[in-house]
Amino acid sequence: MNLPFDDWLPQQRWYGGRSREFSSATPDVVVTLRDDLDLVLLTVNYAEGRPEHYQILVRWDAAPIDEYSVVARIGSDTEHGERTGYDALYDPAAAHFLMTLIDSSAQVGDIRFAKEPEVTLPLQAAPRVSSAEQSNTSVIFDQDAILKVFRRITPGINPDIELNRVLARAGNPHVARLLGSFETTLDREPYALGMVTEFAANSAEGWDMALTSTRDLFAEGDLYADEVGGDFAGESHRLGEAVASVHSTLAAELGTSQVPFPLDTVLERLQSVADAVPELQPHAQSIEERYRKLADQEITVHRVHGDLHLGQVLRTTEGWLLIDFEGEPGQPLDERRRPDSPMRDVAGMLRSYEYAAYQRLIERGGDAQHDKQLAARAREWVNRNVSSFCDGYAAASGTDPRDHAELLAAYELDKAVYEVGYEARYRPSWLPIPMKSILRILGV
């Protein structure tokens, strides 16, 4: 196979190695699924550090529909005569064939396809590639199912498949039901390649709903949050119930344990970010002192979502769904599967509420960031929705996150420190959002 992967791969939006110096992309594993369709595993080497593996499905010669003909074209291969390779996920026939392999629980070479028990796959549905920006590629089959194909693959048990399977088989109503998956083995390690879940038709992302609410609030400067038509507090209460339900199921199905507060982990992140971001350095000592208050505390842990925020929840006509159980981006797989306090997920949601409110002030620019009335409205909106979320969580679980104030604050600080590092590197204009939150939590 002689496709120009070196040129093509770094241009893809799901490519995750942009912060590293790219060296080469070599097709080390090629599995022929049928005569015109290959599953290719690339080994991607960098100037420094460990190589990574990426998955590409290559459709030969038959071009995708016109809408995707440019973006899907990989290039020409002259080793086997003149032929053109395309990203197969943009070809409806190839995407449909993948679904049939999952439906039949087929094995092709070392690729194992599996359908979940007692499910029906929509084999007659028309596939289309999702336009959402993400690190994987998703193909939506009408209003019935979504096939997520992992691009950068890592060894070990995939937490997204694992936790979706546990929650679906337990009958939890707050996840999209897992329908099937496919995987392979490299160097005696399992590698998840993709998964199929029910498609959340007619759903709205929690982030978009929250932004609509804050927009309505700021447009009505003389009204309080509970007086504006787009008040989000009721949805926040129901969202708290949904998160608590998922936590309860994970704890019941996979068990809980008592472990020390992860002091070393949070201190390592704090030191790393403080070294890189001067704005954080004056507050690093105070943050460390807050962490060390929990040094001798045992906390209850179980499997959690791990990267929960308003962009990871969908509101359907039936209620809230939690999606994307892959854990914190960039972390090793064993860390993403490690049990953690449910306060980690709660803190992620509380941080997301602050972003939804204060992002609006930054977007308005000029004096908006310093407008005391708008700032008061933003704080009011955050407090109202945080309270409603915690009320809902407490109602469903019997445990109020606010009763664990020191632990919750520590996880909020850890999340905000992570955000400081991210914003300083990628969105400097947003850096005030996590910095102000850190000052608020510290009482400065």
From Swiss-Prot:
It catalyses: D-maltose + ATP = alpha-maltose 1-phosphate + ADP + H(+). It is an enzyme of class 2 (transferase). One of its GO terms (biological process) is trehalose biosynthetic process. One of its GO terms (molecular function) is ATP binding. Pfam families: APH (PF01636), Mak_N_cap (PF18085). Its EC number is 2.7.1.175. Pathway: Glycan biosynthesis; glycogen biosynthesis. InterPro entries: Aminoglycoside_PTrfase (IPR002575), Kinase-like_dom_sf (IPR011009), Mak_N_cap (IPR040999). Keywords: ATP-binding, Carbohydrate metabolism, Glycogen biosynthesis, Glycogen metabolism, Kinase, Nucleotide-binding, Transferase. Catalyzes the ATP-dependent phosphorylation of maltose to maltose 1-phosphate. Is involved in a branched alpha-glucan biosynthetic pathway from trehalose, together with TreS, GlgE and GlgB. Monomer. Belongs to the aminoglycoside phosphotransferase family. This is Maltokinase. The lineage of its organism: Bacteria, Bacillati, Actinomycetota, Actinomycetes, Mycobacteriales. The gene is mak.
